Amino acid sequence: MKRRDFLRNSIPAAAIFPAIVDGYSVKAFNADSPLMRALMNPAVDTDHVLVIIQLNGGNDGLNMVIPISNYSGYYNARTNIAIPEAKILKLNGNTQTGLHPKMTGMQTLFNDQKLNIVQAVGYPDPNFSHFRATDIWMSGSDADKNVTTGWTGRYLSTEYPNYPVGYPNATMPDPLAIQIGSISSLALQGPSINMGMSITDPTSFYNLLNGIEDPVPDTPAGHELAYIRKIAELTNQYAKRIKEAAGLVTQQTAYPDNDLAAQLKIVARLIGGGLKTRIYMVSHGGFDTHSQQTEAADTTIGNHATLLTEVSTAIKAFMDDCKYLAIDERVIGMTFSEFGRRIKSNGSMGTDHGAAAPMFLFGKNVMPGITGNNPSMPAGANVNDNIPFQYDFRSVYASILEKWFCVTQNDLETILFKNFQSLDVINDASCTGKKPDNQNAGDNLISMYPNPFTESDTVTIRFTTKGGHTLIQVIDALGRVVRTPVDAQYTLGNYSITFDNWGLPSGAYYARLQNGTLQQVKPMLKVRG
């Protein structure tokens, strides 16, 4: 049996990767990937943090951010679930738009100039399947492209191009990204490996780190057990850094009793404890409200109202805690859902899968206010009418990458595959990153010059091999191998080759080096000459 199969089939991952913080267990993604071999795959040096909140199921943005200026159109389209105009929460300096009455926390953040509402975010030719639409948002792809990498994973691979070789190191001793949840997110998938780790189900702390172990027998099964123990040992070393950071925060502000709040409390604790982790992902489910979205007697309460209460109170508590922990200058957050809901409600007091919906950007360094206009709605909306998108969701991504993480225009095109408009949603003065430190950290095994390059350029690929079979592949944005410039036996040393890029379309590519157990992927960008 192969080691990866033994690992996968012998005991649950949660049993291999022990608990570390607030009763949540930790595991690395991709049990059979190179990430597993390096397991100490941490990472970061910047002080800027992005917290991504996924609202699973397709949130009804029209009942969350309510168009007061077109209240009659809104009410007529959904008379059985519409929020009474008198109960809509007002926003300072804006008489056109309001919030669901259960979102007093978000109202406070808006009035305190710590919230930006981006109206009608979507993309062309929207998909209404939960799974496919989620993949589109996670990958940052066009609706007709099946991209196998995530937008944050590609970003992290450009920011930390040597990862995971030579990690952890003094520049970035911590995870690049942390997701709270048991399912690995496509958003964190890099060109070759997942760039994050997850904190998952509640269990005991470090049950493997300090446990007493019997000697390993000198048998094939014993050798596999030794391999598992070695992986567990490396994982515990990595988890130890997280536990140390969490242990430095002994007091936090109050949080409400809901699952999203529990996740955000962990995030605040880890940031406050000094982790340099760049991106955190959390999620909250239940937003697929086809029926019983509201109570018949009172549309301000019901299933959707409960969800919005949990989101609002959790985010407000998180921001209060960030201020208390003196980390609010470092943190911004965003919400997204795989799609919105239809303009017109259905006969079951619910809403069906729709297109565009608003996003929340929150934090001390977001530009406060409302980006865009209230969504346009036809006078007599029918069951097939959708809210048209005003902003492509990748414009929001691009704005965060450019203005919060200081990503260059060339790297933006590599990450998002094309240019998208920059929105005034982040304070420009926030961009103070240390990109050279990040990009020089770790061991550089492969590089290209020039990069970006044109059809007429002579591209040189330099690489280091420890000897033996060495493979270099050039992969396009869809994950297809389009060139194999190196596939041969080499002796230990440094080498240079000329890469023939003739005939390749303009766009983002990745050069992947594989040499034994070593693997490294670097982004490439071909531009029009």
Segments (PLM) and residue ranges:
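Conserved hydrophobic/aromatic pocket- or pore-lining residues that grip, position, or stack substrates
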Residues: 282, 338, 451
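Feature for exported/extracytoplasmic and membrane-associated proteins, marking the mature portion
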Residues: 1-313, 317-325, 344, 358-431
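Low-complexity, Pro/Thr/Ser/Gly/Ala-rich linker/spacer regions in secreted
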Residues: 428-442
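Hydrophobic alpha-helical bundle architecture
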Residues: 321-329, 333-352, 360
